[in-house]
């Protein structure tokens, strides 16, 4: 076909189809151009491209930024760049290439003060990227928690979750170093000054707040959560951290079982409290040939420590008994009590099971439906176990350590009855406490919107009527559940990514789903952040201003190195 024939307009139906085809191709080409332009911008701002198109001084500056970025990401001391990284790089370059190439690395500024300034610059850059996104008017949710660092300085961490491009993004919003003896109202003032005053964000876009149930967050005198909800005009949903609630449930224990736990901890403290005792037990365990040779400490602030401590004490019970006899300790008498050892076996099982549940509700980017399934499933499991023990033929298969202990040891019927009653009382108490901390009425809205979890489960049109949706929403769900293409997307994408992907085609259902999935259900990210803080701020670095390092170490944004270099090349006057 000649160019002239392609330009000729055909008014026939066939020609109309060809014209429509041309328009479609043009739109696709525009989309492709936009896609490739984004990829080009991304490549142009990458360190690899920048290093090829700049002078030696600019390359040295970029290298300084890249090293500082890695130092912060790895939570290293700022002196590591000059004392470890640079000498190591020079050794490698000198070995593989020559001295002249290695000497070029000396032009890279890597002193501790320089690295500190670079990290501060990168942190401000990442903060600006995040705030620019949030200032666009998108909805967001926050989780917050407060703790103290090695220097006894209160620190407030706030994480944010928001919709960006094709999924939820979670990022550190702010790390605030606070004054001592700060109250809940003071915390709110600090947050208000930062989020509204400094970042210019509007609380009306905050759709979710998550915190633990500590007094400084929810106490009647602190009123932090209450003030935050007032600031959002009560449009935000407050979630008490699921992990914290589950940890509170595990603390409900009868006096008899608490006595077993306390004695186990006392034995551990007797051995671990002395380095000599620890070494002697290690030697004894090594000679006997057991898998583990050390006991573990228990601490109240570590959620998973109880189960691990009890399991290790039970596993090494014979070795500990021999050791205590050799030390002529009265604690050896504890292991001669069969009922105590049997209860120890049960506690190691039940706390191990609670630990597994705790781990299931940890992690990033988990939706509230997943948490609800884990909690409701465990509540049903507790009821089933109670029914199993009350039956004419009770079984202990759900507690493998206890079952093995009963099978391997001769335990009289009276002891078994006492232990069975103790277990039943504990399981009943756990069920009641779960119902208190996870009341069913709190999850009614989730059950009413169960279609969000799987919109393709309603193949029968009549089943959609029972969902109490608006007519427009019913029509969208009817069309959505009939799409095989979108069903394939549903299978491959996360739940949040799926609803974001179809927001233009099904706006009502998508908006409703995103608003329910957006709020945090735990403060896991804050706990993870405090763990990072303990690595950054040590006894030797107790005067460190941790906020910039925390920002770079935890940020989900990737620095735009091209923008950073341009800013450095054109400083403000």
Curated annotation (Swiss-Prot):
Q: Where in the cell is it found?
A: Membrane
How does this protein sit in the membrane? Single-pass membrane protein
The residues exposed to the Extracellular compartment are 1-513
Cellular component terms per the entry's GO annotation: membrane
Region (Disordered) residue ranges read: 1-51
Residues annotated as transmembrane: 514-533
Transmembrane listed as a keyword: yes
Give the Cytoplasmic compartment stretches of this protein. 534-573
Identify the keywords attached in UniProt to this record, alphabetized.
Answer: Membrane, Transmembrane, Transmembrane helix
Major subcellular location class: membrane
Family affiliation: Belongs to the FAM200 family.
Q: What is this protein called?
A: Protein FAM200A
Organism equals Macaca fascicularis
């Amino acid at each position: 076909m000649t160019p002239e024939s392609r330009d000729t307009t055909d008014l026939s139906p066939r020609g109309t189809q060809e014209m429509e085809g041309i328009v479609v191709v043009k739109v696709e080409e525009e989309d492709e151009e936009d896609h490739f332009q984004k990829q080009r911008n991304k490549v142009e701002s990458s360190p690899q491209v920048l290093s090829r198109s700049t002078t030696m001084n600019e390359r040295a500056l970029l290298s300084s930024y890249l090293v500082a970025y890695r130092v912060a990401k790895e939570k290293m001391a700022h002196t590591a760049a000059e004392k470890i990284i640079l000498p190591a790089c020079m050794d490698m370059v000198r070995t593989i290439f020559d001295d002249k190439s290695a000497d070029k690395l000396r032009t890279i500024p890597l002193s501790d003060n320089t690295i500190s300034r670079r990290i501060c610059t990168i942190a401000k850059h990442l903060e600006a990227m995040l705030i620019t996104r949030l200032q666009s008017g998108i909805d967001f949710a926050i989780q917050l928690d407060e703790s103290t660092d090695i220097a006894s300085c209160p620190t407030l961490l706030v994480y944010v979750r928001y919709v960006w491009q094709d999924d939820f993004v979670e990022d550190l919003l702010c790390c605030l170093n606070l004054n001592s003896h700060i109250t809940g109202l003071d915390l709110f003032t600090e947050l208000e000054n930062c989020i509204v005053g400094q970042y210019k964000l509007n609380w009306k876009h905050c759709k979710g707040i998550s915190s633990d149930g500590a007094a400084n967050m929810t106490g009647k005198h602190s009123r932090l959560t209450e003030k935050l909800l007032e600031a959002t005009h009560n449009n935000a949903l407050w979630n008490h951290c699921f992990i914290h609630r589950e940890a509170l449930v595990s603390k409900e224990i009868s006096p008899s079982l608490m006595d077993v736990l306390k004695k186990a901890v006392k034995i551990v403290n007797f051995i671990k409290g002395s380095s000599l005792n620890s070494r002697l037990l290690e030697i004894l365990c090594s000679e006997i040939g057991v898998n583990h040779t050390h006991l573990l400490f228990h601490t109240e602030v570590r959620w998973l420590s109880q189960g691990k401590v009890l399991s290790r004490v039970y596993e090494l019970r014979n070795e500990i008994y021999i050791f205590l006899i050799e030390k002529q300790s009265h604690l050896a008498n504890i292991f001669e009590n069969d009922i105590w050892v049997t209860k120890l076996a049960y506690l190691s099982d039940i706390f191990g099971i609670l630990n597994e549940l705790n781990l299931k509700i940890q992690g990033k980017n988990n939706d509230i439906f997943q948490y609800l399934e884990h909690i409701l499933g465990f509540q049903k499991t507790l009821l089933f176990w109670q029914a199993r023990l009350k039956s004419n033929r009770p079984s202990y298969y759900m507690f493998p350590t206890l079952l093995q202990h009963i099978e391997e040891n001769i335990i009289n019927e009276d002891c078994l009855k006492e232990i069975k009653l103790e277990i039943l009382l504990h399981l009943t108490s756990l069920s009641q406490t779960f119902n208190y901390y996870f009341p069913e009425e709190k999850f009614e809205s989730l059950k009413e919107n169960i279609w969000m979890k799987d919109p393709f489960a309603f193949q029968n049109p009549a089943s959609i009527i029972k969902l109490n949706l608006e007519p427009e929403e019913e029509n969208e769900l009817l069309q959505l559940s009939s799409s095989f293409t979108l069903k394939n997307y549903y299978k491959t994408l996360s739940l949040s990514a799926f609803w974001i992907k179809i927001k233009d085609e099904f706006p009502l259902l998508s908006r409703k789903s995103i608003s329910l999935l957006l709020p945090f259900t735990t403060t896991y990210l804050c706990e993870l952040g405090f763990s990072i803080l303990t690595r950054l701020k040590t006894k030797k670095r107790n005067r460190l201003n941790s906020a910039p390092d925390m920002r770079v170490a935890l940020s989900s944004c990737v620095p735009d190195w091209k923008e950073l270099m341009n800013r450095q090349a054109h400083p403000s006057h």
